[in-house]
Design a protein with these regions (language model features):
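A cross-family phosphate/adenosyl-ligand binding-site feature
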Residues: 1-137, 142-201
């Protein structure tokens, strides 16, 4: 287990991939921000769903917007780098964070992380991750995707690296199907994040 962070608040990097469950990211980020410093990285597909978060939970969205929690995406990586010697955002995020949490983790991003692909800010940060520090994922996808054999294979590959997975919940999904694949609830993800850091959150 990693040494507990001493002398300052833990730093949690929250990644969100292209799942409709991204509408829950403001609430999750706020819950984590009660106990840690938080920054958020969204994929381009996740931005589509984050834009729907206000309609999903207006109160959480308003608090999130007022919180000052930084939200980064691919454009920030490219805007920050103009010439050799400039900061590389995914490398800086790796240095900054004590913990990487990807919630929701889509089927596509799961496949990318398990196979080492790195074509956006989130996957580049994961590919550069220091595995002496904890890494937690919370998958969220349609039941058919969740039960696909490759999903178990990809999660097993991540576990070999030391990545902890918060299993999805079974419920009626956004697509109308009933079954496993829903993002775990916010308290479960926060608890897993704390456990990864040796904290009882």
């Amino acid at each position: 287990a990693p040494a507990r962070v001493v002398g300052r608040r833990p730093r949690v990097l929250l990644g969100a991939a292209g799942s409709v469950a991204t509408v829950k990211v403001p609430k999750l980020a706020l819950a984590l921000a009660e106990v840690a410093d938080v920054r958020v990285v969204v994929t381009e597909k996740a931005k589509t769903f984050l834009a729907k978060a206000e309609a999903y939970d207006a109160a959480a969205w308003a608090t999130f917007q007022a919180s000052g929690i930084e939200v980064l995406s691919d454009a920030d990586e490219w805007d920050a780098w103009q010439e050799i010697g400039d900061d590389v955002v995914h490398v800086e995020l790796r240095k900054w964070a004590d913990l990487l949490v990807v919630a929701p983790l889509s089927a596509n991003s799961l496949a990318k992380l398990a196979n080492g692909l790195c074509d956006d800010l989130l996957s580049c940060t994961a590919r550069a991750w220091d595995f002496d520090k904890p890494f937690v994922v919370a998958p969220a996808m349609n039941t058919a995707m969740w039960t696909h054999p490759l999903t178990a294979t990809h999660l097993a590959d991540l576990r070999v690296l030391g990545v902890a997975a918060v299993p999805p919940a079974s419920k009626k999904l956004a697509c109308g199907d009933v079954g496993p694949g829903a993002l775990a609830d916010v308290p479960a993800i926060v608890t897993a994040a704390g456990a990864a850091l040796g904290e009882a959150w």
